[in-house]
Amino acid sequence: MDQSSRYANLNLKESDLIAGGRHVLCAYIMKPKDGFGNFLQTAAHFSAESSTGTNVEVSTTDDFTRGVDALVYEIDEANNVMKIAYPIELFDRNVIDGRAMIASFLTLTIGNNQGMGDVEYAKMHDFYVPPAYLRLFDGPSTTIRDLWRVLGRPVVDGGFIVGTIIKPKLGLRPQPFADACYDFWLGGDFIKNDEPQGNQVFAPFKETVRAVNEAMRRAQDKTGEPKLFSFNITADDHYEMVARGEYILETFADNADHVAFLVDGYVAGPAAVTTARRAFPKQYLHYHRAGHGAVTSPQSKRGYTAFVLSKMARLQGASGIHTGTMGFGKMEGEAADRAMAYMITEDSADGPFFHQEWLGMNPTTPIISGGMNALRMPGFFDNLGHSNLIMTAGGGAFGHIDGGAAGAKSLRQAEQCWKAGADPVEFAKDHREFARAFESFPHDADALYPNWRNSLKLAAA
């Protein structure tokens, strides 16, 4: 059935829709399936399924219903681009406080439309949120400024937070795990649980929390510097998440503000993120996105992009989210990911299709991880343009030839090298831990700095 007469209006102007402030706008890359309708007909069916319609006209439809139809307002068939305007009245709101929810946003904009028989694929690449709807989201309650404050740094441009993930990701018992934390903290700032770490039979949660608390206190006494840890509180059950968080805060006591809470936001979903945001508003909310590649990968033509995921995370209240390495690490990514980092940190930013004003909503910190080490960092910072972020380098720290503490120091020295505008090989001559990173990661060293062996007088590793 051709629904384009009802669910499409190509006379609408995007500027007018934005000025009106009553629509969420979404941009998709969509391809109709052969043998069905043309591009506009398929787009209109997609819009109907995403709002008030179905595959037939129903007798219960009235004038009010038609007034909240989602409408296709722009198409670019040559590039498979489709833009849809969703009236904000369509989106579900909390009964308890009238707030907006990402679950409803996803259900409409990327729900049943993903399984439509006449759509070969459709993927959301950007969305715009009008002020009236944006103000209904929680947004972050804490930011990187809170971590800088704990670390004793300026709360503006407080700089690079040197972090790691304890490796191996599974298999360490509580005391060896805590010992690895202590080792890294002798040179670094921040440690996170890897995403599967929790309450395994070989590493009971409470025992691990107590051991990490003791290791943090020893490291702080040894270095005279504050330290940070991000604990995974992800669970299927709201009460389990709260119980884990409360036990951590009780154990760390006067160091409670040194603790962040990590949530596997993609696999556990928006409800888990909101549980952490609302139950623990004083804690830094660390959004881990494990599993997101199933829909965000450039190889996947359905779902939504990593850019969309990060923008949703800011709305939900994530203090920080993993944003990849912009192609400088081991995970999928590209230099264009810089736009994602700016979208979640700035108050006014451009996405691939829409400009977004955040109206003073707190920023979300880019957390960089996935195959990074000291040698890759100068190029990464060049691409991003600043170093106000958290980096969690697992192998990049514990793969250092001299151990975790030296690995942490090499990461810090890499940022110092970049800020000084120095040549990395020349800088390494006066910075031992950074120099030893060349020996620790010779494959990267050969690729990035081909003459390093002669310049540093080092043998092949």
UniProtKB/Swiss-Prot annotation:
The UniProt catalytic activity note for this protein reads:
2 (2R)-3-phosphoglycerate + 2 H(+) = D-ribulose 1,5-bisphosphate + CO2 + H2O; D-ribulose 1,5-bisphosphate + O2 = 2-phosphoglycolate + (2R)-3-phosphoglycerate + 2 H(+)
Enzyme Commission number(s)? 4.1.1.39
Keyword terms of this UniProt record:
Calvin cycle, Carbon dioxide fixation, Lyase, Magnesium, Metal-binding, Monooxygenase, Oxidoreductase, Photosynthesis
Q: Which residues of the sequence carry a binding annotation for substrate?
A: 112, 169, 289, 322, 369
| Record-listed N6-carboxylysine modification sites | 192
One GO term of the biological process aspect: reductive pentose-phosphate cycle
Superkingdom in the source lineage:
Bacteria
Q: Site Transition state stabilizer: which residues?
A: 330
**Signal peptide span per the entry?**
none
Please tell me which top-level EC class this enzyme sits in: lyase
**Which cofactors are reported in the record for this sequence?**
Mg(2+)
- Name the Gene Ontology molecular function terms of this record: magnesium ion binding; monooxygenase activity; ribulose-bisphosphate carboxylase activity
Residue positions annotated to bind Mg(2+) are 192, 194-195
The entry's other comment says: The basic functional RuBisCO is composed of a large chain homodimer in a 'head-to-tail' conformation. In contrast to form I RuBisCO, the form II RuBisCO are composed solely of large subunits.
The cross-references to PANTHER family, in alphabetical order and at most eight, read: RIBULOSE BISPHOSPHATE CARBOXYLASE, RIBULOSE BISPHOSPHATE CARBOXYLASE LARGE CHAIN
Summary of the function given for this chain in its UniProt record = RuBisCO catalyzes two reactions: the carboxylation of D-ribulose 1,5-bisphosphate, the primary event in carbon dioxide fixation, as well as the oxidative fragmentation of the pentose substrate. Both reactions occur simultaneously and in competition at the same active site.
| Family, similarity comment | Belongs to the RuBisCO large chain family. Type II subfamily.
The subunit field of the Swiss-Prot or TrEMBL record says:
Homodimer.
Supply the NCBIfam families for this chain. PRK13475.1
Task: Name the chain's protein.
Answer: Ribulose bisphosphate carboxylase
> Organism, per UniProt?
Rhodopseudomonas palustris (strain HaA2)
Report the gene name: cbbM
